Swiss-Prot record:
Residues 544-554 have a biased composition (Basic and acidic residues). The gene is ecm14. One of its GO terms (biological process) is proteolysis. This is Inactive metallocarboxypeptidase ecm14. The lineage of its organism: Eukaryota, Fungi, Dikarya, Ascomycota, Pezizomycotina. Its main location: other. Residues 199-521 form the Peptidase M14 domain. Keywords: Cell wall biogenesis/degradation, Disulfide bond, Glycoprotein, Metal-binding, Secreted, Signal, Vacuole, Zinc. Substrate binds at residues 262-265, 320, 337-338, 395-396. It comes from Aspergillus niger (strain ATCC MYA-4892 / CBS 513.88 / FGSC A1513). Residues 1-20 form the signal peptide. Its cofactor is Zn(2+).
Amino acid sequence: MRHLLSLLVLLIASAALVSAVPAGSIITPQPPVEPVHLLSSQPSDPRRPWIRLRDWIIESIWGIEKPASRRFPLNDSPRNRSPPSRILARYGSDVVLRFSLRNHDEAEALAQAADILFLDVWASTPAFVDIRLAEEVIPSLLGLLPNSLQTAYTPLIDNLAERIYTTYPSKKPIGLEGQSGFASSSRPAPKFGDLFFHEYQPLSVIIPWMRLLASMFPSHVRMISVGVSYEGREIPALRLSAGSSTAASGPRKTIIVTGGSHAREWIGTSTVNHVMYTLITKYGKSKAVTRLLQDFDWIMIPTINPDGYVYTWETDRLWRKNRQRTSLRFCPGIDLDRAWGFEWDGGRTRANPCSENYAGDEPFEGMEAQQLAQWALNETQNNNADIVSFLDLHSYSQTILYPFSYSCSSIPPTLESLEELGLGLAKAIRYATHEIYDVTSACEGIVTASAADNNPGRFFPIGGNSGGSALDWFYHQVHATYSYQIKLRDRGSYGFLLPSEHIIPTGKEIYNVVLKLGSFLIGGDSFDVDWESELFDLSKDESDLDSRYSKSNDRSPAYLHNANGPLPNIDEDEDKEWVMVEEEDYTDDDDDDDDDDEEEEEEEEDTYWATEHTYEFRRRR
């Protein structure tokens, strides 16, 4: 009854909200918005209209009084200051709770309560469910649960605003030193790769960086687009290949690696970047990597959801879906991992576009999913490609999932091979960092209503998967025999807000996955390569991705190039080295003047450094 009343109030209130949304017939990409401007503004209520409506429903129906503003201690932040007002206003009372489940009835009760209250389910397994909600909603949630669940929870994140703030890049880069136009002679210059992966990077930095890699390594790297987003942004990718594809040689075996389907899962985007950078820079030096690029085309797509990814940097760090308009214009967005055409089951969420799992009103309504599918089909039908593997990186829970996602009653015909390779991938990850990744079918953990066939309007995806997934589509439609969805770090301590120091270790884990996958596919023809010795090995403490960047050089660089400008022509035969620095204004004053530094820091507002700085790439002779 409460659920029906909630929906009734929602429909009545939606009319007023819809009329308040400006109409527009043409969708054009918006110019980049500096987060510092957003954070420094003082909106009367920065919550999205849907969130305001949801909170009003809860307060009205369950009689919850609006709590006083939550107070954050200034010393809690690693930056020694509280989050900016915009973050506090949006997330100030939000927490993440983990509920422990003991049986199906408890899972079903929690599913129903989360559905009624429109809660954001972060992750779920047959043993636990992580839910994000406002503190003031906790009494309402507990009131809808059986007694056994009312004490079966623990707080995972009790200061969500603070945790969100720490995921954005710090104001100052790490390890940058020296004067403008010169590399330091006292120690090696900062390593290009390490510097880039010290922080999460916005799309405005990632795309110029990809262009630079394509220009630096034209022999085996080419920048391509696999489609256009709903707001008109290109979906960028790098094609890594050192082989040739002709009709005489037969179809070119192709492996696709994607990230960022869900916008808030930044670690997926950063991991794709790290893996492709490692493959690019190790080509010609590593026998294993050289063999991989000779035998396969690698399509590396950092994010298939550029609109959503940009939105997480500019407005809402925890945005999940794309930014496509829906039937409820104040609830935009389609879940791109439920929008694919194979066994699409979007009827379950069709009535609620505000759901984080909303799959659209029909298969492939999600623009970016449609674009990637069309590109993949065109590759196989017209460009002599044979897509043999698909790796889809998500977060979180440290799990390797194989098809099928839509149903456990359907057994994939290559199940034995999928399980064998999946266990091998998990072993390769342990080799890199000693982290444990579980291996299971993507369907396991799906919890539906006990009479799902008679009540198709509701479901609770414990494992985060269902019909319409990219995993199932690539496996079934284009016959990518070895298709996996890999949920990256961690197991819940940080959730979607994984600290940036995990970027490089996670990248090493998936690099090992790529090596293991390649060696498995090449099989008996790879005796000339010692694959195991090429893996990242924690016991060896490999701190360098490429030893060439550890050489010191006391000569001033003769070439400067701004990453956001046009790329130069580079002679691939020249043996040059590159380092990355930040463009800054330097003076002859002592840079170590502590008094000046302290005074400057007091005057500065909190900013997101990565969206304000400009990278330069310096060529060393």
